[in-house]
Swiss-Prot record:
This is Histone-lysine N-methyltransferase, H3 lysine-4 specific. It comes from Candida albicans (strain SC5314 / ATCC MYA-2876) (Yeast). Gene3D superfamilies: 3.30.70.330, SET domain (2.170.270.10). The RxxxRR motif forms an adapter helix that bridges the nucleosome and ubiquitin. Residues 1024-1040 form the Post-SET domain. The keyword Transferase applies. Residues 97-119 have a biased composition (Polar residues). It comes from the Eukaryota. Keywords: Chromatin regulator, Chromosome, Methyltransferase, Nucleus, S-adenosyl-L-methionine, Transferase. The gene is SET1. Residues 898-1015 form the SET domain. A motif (RxxxRR motif) lies at residues 867-872. Residues 85-96 have a biased composition (Low complexity). One of its GO terms (molecular function) is RNA binding. InterPro entries: COMPASS_Set1_N-SET, Nucleotide-bd_a/b_plait_sf, Post-SET_dom, RBD_domain_sf, Set1-like, Set1_fungi, SET_assoc, SET_dom.
C-alpha cells in the first residue's frame, strides 16, 4: 500500500488505496504519481510527495515548492518492535537512523517516464486485480485530512509517568542532529589505543564472519574423515586407536578395511574425530599437520595420511592400489609354491624309483623263498583243515567255507601287517552304534593285539593263528547285545605260521632281555668301580694335606680363633653323667645272650648311631652298611619290577577268566612263577640278622630240584595238549556243534573230527544197507550245491515273524489306515525295546556261566591293597551318607556329583546312564529345574497336555514348591521309572534352600541305566493308568 497526495483531482488532501506489486527481493512497488517532482522514495518501500512536511498546528499536509530541498523529516516510532504500522508497512525512517535516497527507475518501452502511463495498455484487456476500487469502497469513518497518522506507543517517554497518558503525544522532529553512521564511531574507538578507563584492546581489523555448517546449510559438509594407507598388517585396532587418541582428541569411529573375498587386511584405515562437522574438520587438519611435521611412525613405517573427500575418490584409489598389491603378492607366492612343488615332485619321483627298485628286489627274494617254503598252513585245531595264505574262512552259517580272497582296506594295511585277523561286518554289528571298546570288552579273554573300526566293520588283529582260530571258533555267531557276532577269519597273503620259529623267537627274546639287564648292571658296577678305585684315590692324593701345609695351618688358626669359649654348666654335667650310665647299661645288655624277640625290641627303641663326620674327599672311599642294605633292597625291588615290565608283552599275565581249554602245563608254570615272585619279595623284606641265621641250601640240593623240574617238563611235553586233563569240569576235546535240524552231508563232515569219531560212525552205520550209487563223489557235489541254492539270504534270516496283533488282515498295512500301536506291543519288534526278563544294564551276556568274565579279576592284588581299598570305601560312605546332615554347601554338592550321561533307553525314550561304577549310598546328581509354586505347576501341566509336548518333568519338593525341568533343567530329568529301582531321591538343604538329590540304593556298574521309583498314586480310572515298561522281575505293570 502507498500513500499518494493527489492535488489535481478527487478529494483534496485524501488518500487512495492502490494495489502493490512485486516480490520479497524487489520490495513493494511504489504507486505511480502524476507529479514526478512531488514523489520521494524511501528505501523502495514507501512513496511520499517530495518536499512535503507536516505542520504541528493544524495537522495539514502542505507540499513545498518544486525543486526545493527536502526537509529533515522525523516520524513517530511504531509500537511494534520492527517499526511497522498496523497495516504491515514500515513507517518513514528518521534522519538519525537512515538517510533516504531516491531510487532510479528505468523506463519501459512505450511508457512515459514521468507518468508511467503506457499508451498500449488500452489494447490489452484490463484485469480485475489491476483496477483501482478505492474510490468505490465507502469509508468506515469521517475523513480528516489534517490527521493522517496515529501514535500507538512512544518508547522514549518513561512508562512510570502517569500524567503522560492523558496528554496528546505529538513529535515534530525538533532538535534533530545531522545524520551520521554509528559504525564509524565504534570502529574508530576500537582502532585507537586503549584508554585508562577501559581494558578493551583495539581490533587490528574488523572481525571476520564465520559460517557454521548445520543441517540447514547448502553444499557439501567440510571434510573430516582421515585415511591412513600402507599400514603394517600387524597393527591392531586398539593399538591404533590409543595411538591417535593420545593426541588429546577422542575418536568417533574407526574402520579397518579388509578384502571382502579373503578377509585379509588391506592396510587402510579410516577414522573421524568427535564433534560437529566444523570442529571435526579442524581437528583432522591439525592432526594431519602434526603427523607430517613430526614424521610419526608405526612399527617402523611412516604414516601416510590424508583427508578423504566427500565422494570417496581418494579412498577408492587407495583400495584399488592395495588390491593390486595383494594380487601381485599372491601371484608371487603361487609361483614360488609351484617351484617348490616341482622340486618336491622331482624328489618324490626319484625316491619312488628307488623304492620300486628296492621292492622289486625284495619281492624277487620273497618269491624265491616262498617257492622253497610250503604255501599251506595246517590248522592247529583240526589237522584236516588246511589254510592257505590270502584266504578267508566264512562263518558257521556258511559251514566255515574257505574263500580264496581277503577283504582288507588299504588304510588298514599298515596296521594289520600281514597278520591273521577276524572281520565282523558292519551289517551284522553296526560301527555307528557299537564302539570298539565294547568289542574289546567282549573279547578280552583272548590275546588280540588291536581292534580296528572301519566303515566296512570291525577288524580284530592277532599275532598268532592259534589264538585267532580259537576266538573265531568260540565266539562265532554268539549273541552280542541285540546283535550276533558273525565272524570271518582272514589270513593275509604274506603270513607264515611257523610255530617253532615263533617259539625260538620268544626264547631268544627272553635271552635278549636277560642279557640287556645284565649288561646294564655291569655298566653300573663298572662306573662305580672306576669312580671309587681310580678317580677317588687320585683326587685324594691331589688334595693331600702334605702338599698344602701353609693352607692347613692358616685354616686351623682361623678355626681356633672362630671357636667361642665353651662354659660348662650344671645341666651339661648332668647330661654327661647320664650318657655314661646309658653306655654302661648298653654294654651290660650286650653281654647277655641275645634272643631274637628281645633283640628286635631293643633294636626298635635303640637310638640311631650318629655317623662320624668325614670330609667330602674321603667319603668316596667308605661305604655305609645301612645304605648298602637299603640300596640292595631297593635295587632288588626295582629289578623285580623291571623284569615284570620287560616280560609283560612276551609272557602275558594269566587271566582268571574261563576258557574252553586250559592246559596244566601253563597253569603249573604260572603258579611256579607266582611262587617265585612271592619268595623274592619275602626275601627282600627279611632283615639281615634273619638272613644270617637262616640255613643256606646246598648247591647239590638245588641241582637235584632243577633235574626233577626238567624231567617233569619233558614228560608233560610228550602228551598232546588236547587230551590232557583240565582243572575245571570235564568237557569235550572239540566244541559241540548244535543240532540245526537236517543232518546232511556237511553236518556229517563237520562232526567227524578224528579217527575215533570215524570208528564210532562206522559202528553206528554198520547195520544200514549200502546205497547203490555208482558215483558217490558226483552225488555229494550235487547235494552240496542243492543245499547252497536252497539257503536263505542273510538279510531274510533276521526277519522275524510278527505277533498276531501286528499282522495285516487285508494284506497291506496301507489299506488299513492309521492306528496307534501300544507301547507294550513295540517291545516285540523294536530292537532297543527287546528287554524281556533281562536285567537293567547295557553290558549283557548270553550265557552267564560261559560268557560273563570272572568277577574276581582283582584277586591278583595283594590282601593289603584290598584291605586299604575297603577301609577307604567305608570311610567315604560314612563321610557322605552315614554322618550326613541335611544342610550342605553348594561347593560340596557340585563336587560330589558323579559323571553321568543320557542316551536312548530301552524303557522309554531317553535314559540316564552311569559313566563309571557307583557305590551304594553315594550321591549321583541333583535334579535341577525351575522352582515354581504348586498353582503354577498345575497350570503348566494342563498347558503341556494341550500343546502336546508329551512328557512333563515336574518334581514336587513340598506342598508349595515344585521343580519344573521341562524347558529349563539338567539331564537328571531323563531318569526313568523302574519297579525295582537302583536310585532314590532325597530332599536336602543347601544354603537355606531345599534341593532334590538322587542317591544310589545299590552298587551300580558302569554303563548301567539309572532308575527311580516315581511313586505315583493309584488311579481309580483304569483308562488313565500308564503302562510300565521297565521289564524288571517284580514289575507292577503300571506306573500309577
Amino acid at each position: 500500500m502507498s500513500y499518494n497526495n493527489r492535488s489535481g483531482g478527487g478529494a483534496s488532501g485524501g488518500y487512495s488505496r492502490r494495489g502493490y506489486h512485486g516480490s520479497h527481493r524487489g520490495g513493494y512497488r511504489t504507486g505511480r504519481s502524476k507529479y514526478p517532482e512531488d514523489r520521494y522514495l524511501v528505501g523502495g518501500m514507501l512513496s511520499l510527495n517530495k518536499g512535503s512536511h507536516y505542520e504541528s498546528s493544524d495537522n495539514r499536509y502542505i507540499p513545498n515548492e518544486i525543486g526545493s530541498k527536502s526537509p529533515e523529516n522525523r516520524s513517530h516510532r511504531s509500537s511494534t518492535k520492527d517499526g511497522r504500522t498496523p497495516s504491515g508497512l514500515s513507517t518513514p525512517l528518521s534522519s538519525s537512523d537512515k538517510v533516504s535516497t531516491p531510487i532510479s527507475i528505468e523506463s519501459i518501452n512505450g511508457s512515459d517516464r514521468n507518468t508511467g502511463v503506457n499508451n498500449k495498455d488500452s489494447e490489452f484487456p484490463k484485469l480485475s486485480h489491476h483496477s483501482d476500487f478505492t474510490s468505490t469502497i465507502p469509508f468506515s469513518r469521517s475523513i480528516n485530512p489534517q490527521k493522517n497518522f496515529m501514535v500507538i506507543n512512544d518508547s522514549h517517554t518513561p512508562k512510570t509517568d502517569k500524567g503522560i497518558q492523558s496528554k496528546k503525544i505529538r513529535y515534530n522532529g525538533e532538535g534533530v542532529n545531522h545524520v551520521s553512521d554509528p559504525r564509524i564511531a565504534q570502529s574508530n574507538s576500537n582502532l585507537q589505543k586503549p584508554t585508562k578507563k577501559t581494558k578493551k584492546t583495539p581490533y587490528k581489523q574488523l572481525p571476520q564472519p564465520k559460517f557454521v555448517y548445520n543441517s540447514d546449510s547448502l553444499g557439501p559438509a567440510p571434510m573430516s574423515t582421515i585415511i591412513i594407507w600402507d599400514l603394517p598388517i600387524s597393527t591392531s585396532e586398539p593399538f591404533l586407536r590409543n595411538f591417535v587418541s593420545r593426541y588429546g582428541n577422542p575418536l568417533e569411529e574407526m574402520t579397518f578395511i579388509t578384502d571382502p573375498t579373503t578377509a585379509v587386511p588391506l592396510g587402510i584405515v579410516t577414522f573421524k574425530f568427535q564433534g560437529n562437522p566444523q570442529k571435526a574438520s579442524e581437528l583432522a587438519k591439525n592432526f594431519i599437520k602434526t603427523v607430517r611435521q613430526d614424521e610419526l611412525k608405526i612399527d617402523g613405517a611412516t604414516l601416510k595420511i590424508a583427508l578423504n573427500d566427500n565422494e570417496n575418490q581418494l579412498l577408492n584409489r587407495k583400495l584399488e592400489s592395495a588390491k593390486k598389491k595383494m594380487l601381485q603378492q599372491r601371484l608371487q607366492r603361487e609361483q614360488e609354491e609351484e617351484k617348490r612343488r616341482q622340486k618336491l615332485v622331482e624328489e618324490q619321483k626319484k625316491q619312488e624309483l628307488l623304492k620300486k627298485k628296492e621292492k622289486e628286489h625284495q619281492e624277487s627274494v620273497k618269491k624265491e623263498k616262498s617257492v622253497e617254503h610250503e604255501s599251506t598252513i595246517v590248522s592247529t585245531r583240526d589237522k584236516n583243515l588246511v589254510y592257505k595264505p590270502n584266504s578267508t574262512v566264512l562263518s558257521m552259517r556258511h559251514n566255515h567255507k574257505i574263500i580264496s580272497s581277503v577283504i582288507l582296506p588299504k588304510d588298514l594295511e599298515k596296521y594289520i601287517k600281514s597278520r591273521p585277523y577276524i572281520l565282523i561286518r558292519d551289517k551284522y554289528v553296526p560301527t555307528k552304534k557299537i564302539s570298539s571298546h565294547d568289542i574289546k570288552r567282549a573279547l578280552k579273554k583272548y590275546d588280540w593285539t588291536r581292534v580296528l573300526s572301519d566303515k566296512s566293520g570291525f577288524f580284530i588283529v592277532f599275532n598268532s593263528l592259534n589264538e585267532c582260530e580259537r576266538c573265531f571258533l568260540n565266539e562265532d555267531n554268539k549273541k552280542f547285545f541285540e546283535y550276533k557276532l558273525v565272524m570271518e577269519m582272514a589270513i593275509p597273503e604274506g603270513f607264515t605260521n611257523n610255530i617253532r620259529e615263533n617259539e625260538s623267537k620268544s626264547t631268544n627274546d627272553v635271552l635278549d632281555e636277560a642279557t640287556n639287564i645284565l649288561i646294564k648292571e655291569f655298566q653300573t658296577f663298572l662306573a662305580k668301580d672306576i669312580r671309587e678305585r681310580i678317580i677317588a684315590p687320585n683326587i685324594l692324593d691331589l688334595l693331600a694335606h702334605d702338599k698344602y701345609p701353609e693352607l692347613v695351618e692358616e685354616l686351623k688358626s682361623r678355626e681356633q680363633a672362630a671357636k667361642p669359649k665353651v662354659l660348662v654348666t650344671n645341666n651339661q654335667l648332668k647330661e654327661n653323667a647320664l650318657s655314661i650310665l646309658e653306655k654302661q647299661r648298653q654294654l651290660f645288655q650286650q653281654r647277655l645272650p641275645s634272643f631274637r624277640m628281645s633283640h628286635d625290641r631293643t633294636q626298635q627303641h635303640k637310638p640311631k648311631r650318629r655317623n662320624s663326620i668325614i670330609p667330602m674327599q674321603h667319603a668316596l672311599n667308605f661305604d655305609d652298611d645301612e645304605d648298602s642294605e637299603s640300596h640292595s633292597q631297593s635295587e632288588s625291588e626295582d629289578e623285580d619290577e623291571d623284569e615284570t615290565t620287560a616280560s609283560r608283552p612276551l609272557t602275558p599275565v594269566v587271566s582268571t577268566m574261563k576258557r574252553e581249554r586250559s592246559s596244566t602245563i601253563t597253569s603249573i608254570e604260572d603258579d611256579i612263577e607266582l611262587e617265585e615272585r612271592e619268595i623274592k619279595k619275602q626275601k627282600v623284606k627279611v632283615p639281615a640278622i634273619e638272613a644270617e641265621i637262616a640255613p643256606e641250601s646246598s648247591p647239590e640240593e638245588g641241582e637235584e630240584e632243577e633235574k626233577e623240574e626238567v624231567e617233569i617238563k619233558q614228560e608233560a611235553e610228550e602228551v598232546d595238549i588236547k587230551f590232557q586233563p583240565t582243572e575245571e569240569s570235564p568237557r569235550t576235546v572239540y566244541p559241540e556243534i548244535p543240532f540245526s535240524g537236517d543232518f546232511d552231508l556237511n553236518a556229517l563232515q563237520h562232526t567227524i573230527k578224528d579217527s575215533e569219531d570215524l570208528l564210532l560212525a562206522q559202528e553206528v552205520l554198520s547195520e544200514t544197507t549200502p546205497s547203490g550209487l555208482s558215483n558217490i563223489e558226483y552225488w555229494s557235489w550235487k547235494s552240496k550245491n542243492r543245499k547252497d541254492v536252497q539257503e536263505i539270504s542273510q538279510e531274510e534270516e533276521y526277519i522275524e515273524e510278527l505277533p498276531e496283533s501286528l499282522q495285516s488282515t487285508t494284506g497291506s498295512f496301507k489299506s488299513e489306515g492309521v492306528r496307534k500301536i501300544p507301547e507294550i506291543e513295540k517291545i516285540g519288534y523294536l530292537p532297543h525295546r527287546k528287554r524281556t526278563n533281562k536285567p537293567i544294564k547295557t553290558i549283557q551276556y548270553e550265557d552267564e556261566d560261559e560268557e560273563k568274565p570272572n568277577e574276581n579279576t582283582n584277586a591278583v592284588q595283594s590282601s593289603r591293597v584290598n584291605r586299604a581299598n575297603n577301609r577307604r570305601f567305608a570311610a567315604d560312605i560314612t563321610a557322605q551318607i552315614g554322618s550326613e546332615s541335611d544342610v550342605l554347601s553348594l561347593n560340596a554338592l557340585t563336587k560330589r556329583k558323579k559323571p553321568v550321561t543320557f542316551a536312548r533307553s530301552a524303557i522309554h525314550n531317553w535314559g540316564l546312564y552311569a559313566m563309571e561304577p557307583i557305590a551304594a549310598k553315594e550321591m549321583i546328581i541333583e535334579y535341577v529345574g525351575e522352582r515354581i509354586r504348586q498353582q503354577v505347576a498345575e497350570h503348566r501341566e494342563k498347558s503341556y497336555l494341550k500343546t502336546g509336548i508329551g512328557s512333563s518333568y515336574l518334581f514336587r519338593i513340598d506342598d508349595n514348591t515344585v521343580i519344573d525341568a521341562t524347558k529349563k533343567g539338567g539331564i537328571a530329568r531323563f531318569i526313568n521309572h523302574c519297579c525295582s529301582p537302583s536310585c532314590t531321591a532325597k530332599i536336602i538343604k543347601v544354603e537355606g534352600k531345599k534341593r532334590i538329590v538322587i542317591y544310589a540304593l545299590r552298587d551300580i556298574e558302569a554303563n548301567e541305566e539309572l532308575t527311580y521309583d516315581y511313586k505315583f498314586e493309584r488311579e481309580t480310572n483304569d483308562e488313565e493308568r500308564i503302562r510300565c515298561l521297565c521289564g524288571a522281575p517284580g514289575c507292577k505293570g503300571y506306573l500309577n
